[in-house]
A protein has these predicted regions:
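Bacterial Sec-dependent N-terminal signal peptides
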Residues: 1-23
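N-terminal leader/targeting and pre-domain segments
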Residues: 19-62
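Local sequence-structure signature of Cys/Sec-based thiol-disulfide redox active-site neighborhoods
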Residues: 59-91
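Loop/turn elements at helix/coil->beta-strand transitions in domains of secreted/extracellular proteins
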Residues: 63-66, 97, 131
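Extracytoplasmic/periplasmic, Sec-exported soluble proteins
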Residues: 73-81, 118, 138, 142
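Structural alpha/beta surface segment adjacent to cysteine/selenocysteine redox centers
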Residues: 111-122
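Non-catalytic, surface beta->alpha helical segment in thiol-disulfide oxidoreductase systems
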Residues: 122, 127-165
Length: 165
């Protein structure tokens, strides 16, 4: 009986001390990767065919850029594109330029109202900003490839995302 009581007490304490990952609201990449979402994250990170030629061109243009990412852990497009984007970010050594990573519910609503304020209609959405001003965004999927789309945005080549008509 004493052992059962100790076991139950230890279980309650352990459960109270662990915080489950909440994919609705703002979270870090580390929190995402250390959660139940790690398997699809790593599978798609490793599967992204990094175009090093384009990454080197992006590198010289990326220094003043900040990126806000709106995603849904429930969304296959987010599961595919967000890890691929982080593979590019890692190649650029630019993790500090990810301004926010925000998880939305299936209605594409954020906990803090920022998704509605930013006009998010599809996920993932990668918003590129310079000096606090949005310069462009990739919505749901790249037009050519993540690397090429990022480069086109940074080179101000009139990039239009899939829903910009």
């Amino acid at each position: 009986m004493k052992n059962i009581t100790l076991f139950l007490l230890a279980s309650v304490i352990f459960t109270a001390c662990t915080t489950p990952f909440e994919s609705f609201g703002e979270f870090s990449r580390k929190q995402l990767q250390n959660s139940e979402h790690n398997s699809w994250f790593m599978d798609n990170y490793d599967a992204h065919p990094l175009n090093e030629t384009l990454v080197s061109q992006i590198d010289s243009l990326f220094s003043e850029i900040e990126v806000t990412i709106y995603m849904g852990t429930w969304c296959k497009d987010s599961q595919r594109e967000v890890p691929g984007f982080f593979r590019i970010i890692d190649a650029l050594d630019a993790n500090d330029q990810i301004n926010r990573l925000v998880g939305l519910n299936e209605d594409k609503i954020s906990r803090d109202g920022s998704a509605e304020e930013a006009g998010i209609t599809n996920v993932p959405t990668f918003i590129f900003s310079k000096k606090g001003e949005e310069i462009n965004r990739i919505v749901e999927f790249p037009i050519i490839s993540l690397e090429q789309d990022v480069l086109d945005i940074l080179q101000d080549k009139g990039y239009k995302h899939a829903y910009d008509f």
